[in-house]
């Protein structure tokens, strides 16, 4: 793996400085590293990935990883999170491990762990289905009309599971 694409929040100076160091590190070892858009501003946008992208590095916290996963859904490119936030339970790397991991990836010494994505869509009272969404971790349901009863029907892999009022 030699060609990387970095997704990071553009509003945090320390993250941008880290991304520059990461880019320099990769390029000094013969790789390429393009920079991505802020996933917070681009939930509906497609990432414009270079054709030779072999791996996506997400620098941020869990929220950045979740939004990046939505943006790259269906692209079949490995993604790894680098914790630049607080908890980082979705991030596999941190400051102490990132450069060794980059070296290993560039040497072809890595394995890919498949993660399940959730999908869902809303159906209005007239039976019209809304846009399908993908999610890495969870889907939260809330009424846009305030305190209102919601009718929820849950299917798993196309099989009815339960209904809730």
Language model segments and positions:
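ATP/NTP phosphate-donor binding region
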Residues: 1-55, 59, 96-111, 122-133
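Catalytic core of DAGKc-family lipid kinases
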Residues: 89-165
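Short glycine-rich anion-binding loops that position phosphate/pyrophosphate groups of nucleotides
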Residues: 61-64, 85-87
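Active-site catalytic pocket residues across diverse enzymes, especially alpha/beta-hydrolases
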Residues: 72
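Proline-centered loop/turn at the N-terminus of a beta-strand
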Residues: 76-78
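Short glycine/serine/threonine-rich phosphate/pyrophosphate-binding segments
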Residues: 15, 63-69
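General beta-strand structural signal in soluble alpha/beta enzymes
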Residues: 33-38, 81, 113-114, 162-163
């Amino acid at each position: 793996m030699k060609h990387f694409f970095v997704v990071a929040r553009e509003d945090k100076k320390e993250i941008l400085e880290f991304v520059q160091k990461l880019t320099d590190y990769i390029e000094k070892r013969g790789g390429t590293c393009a920079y991505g858009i802020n996933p917070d501003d681009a939930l509906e946008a497609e990432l414009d990935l270079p054709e030779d992208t072999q791996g996506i590095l997400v620098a941020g916290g869990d929220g950045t990883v979740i939004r990046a996963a939505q943006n790259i859904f269906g692209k079949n490119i490995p993604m790894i999170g680098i914790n630049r936030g607080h908890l980082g339970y979705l991030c596999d790397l941190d400051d102490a491990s990132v450069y060794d991991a980059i070296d290993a990836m560039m040497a072809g010494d890595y394995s890919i762990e498949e993660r399940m994505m959730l999908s869902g869509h809303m159906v209005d009272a007239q039976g019209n289905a809304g846009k399908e969404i993908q999610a890495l971790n969870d889907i939260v349901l809330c009424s846009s009309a305030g305190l209102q009863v919601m009718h929820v029907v849950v299917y798993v892999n196309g099989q009815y599971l339960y209904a809730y009022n």
